[in-house]
């Protein structure tokens, strides 16, 4: 079953693993019964797929994924905020942590930032050249810093307006595409869901 979190005993054959024992911990029914949640959860799993190689293990990233699925399943916070937070945790867990406290080029402390470098994965100060990146509002930059600093289960109180959500989506989509060189297919469905929601407002 898709999205089934469990404890398994695996036996490795010549090329594939076979499950010899298993215990289901959570099947995340709330995600499976809702198209939007199912699409978001599929996106989370796709991010894992594009950011890791076969047989690679990453306990930190696994914990972030399971936490995100629990939060998504329980309606604990805004789905879009959760996706952006997980994307940031993904970058950090795979060695591409965003540098949002210091200029990613000259390393000067940032008191203000209006540009994110895709090449260096971080904020750029006003003294350094701004190229191959994305302009960003100060409000969105502060939200990025917040999501980068706090754990997933501590962001449920965060409220973000639609303009900042769109800016965050654009920035993280560009960063992930630039770093991992692959685009999750579920993004197409997410774009359709977002467009449908915008038309209904």
Please give the residue ranges for each predicted region.
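Non-catalytic alpha-helical scaffolds and adjoining flexible linkers that form interface surfaces
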Residues: 1-201
């Amino acid at each position: 079953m898709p999205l089934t979190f469990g404890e398994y005993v695996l036996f490795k054959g010549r090329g594939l693993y076979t499950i010899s024992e298993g215990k289901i911990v959570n099947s995340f029914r709330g995600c499976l019964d809702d198209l939007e949640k199912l699409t978001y959860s599929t996106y989370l799993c796709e991010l894992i797929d594009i950011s890791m190689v076969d047989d690679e293990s990453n306990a930190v990233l696994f914990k972030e994924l399971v936490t995100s699925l629990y939060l998504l399943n329980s309606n604990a916070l805004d789905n879009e905020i959760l996706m952006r937070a997980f994307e940031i945790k993904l970058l950090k867990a795979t060695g591409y942590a965003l540098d949002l406290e210091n200029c990613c080029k000259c390393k000067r402390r940032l008191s203000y930032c209006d540009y994110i470098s895709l090449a260096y994965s971080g904020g750029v100060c006003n003294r350094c050249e701004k190229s191959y990146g994305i302009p960003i509002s100060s409000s969105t930059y502060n939200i990025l810093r917040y999501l980068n600093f706090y754990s997933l289960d501590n962001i449920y109180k965060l409220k973000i307006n639609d303009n900042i959500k769109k800016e965050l989506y654009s920035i993280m989509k560009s960063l992930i595409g630039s770093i991992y060189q692959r685009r999750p297919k579920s993004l197409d469905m997410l774009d359709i869901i977002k467009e449908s929601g915008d038309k209904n407002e």
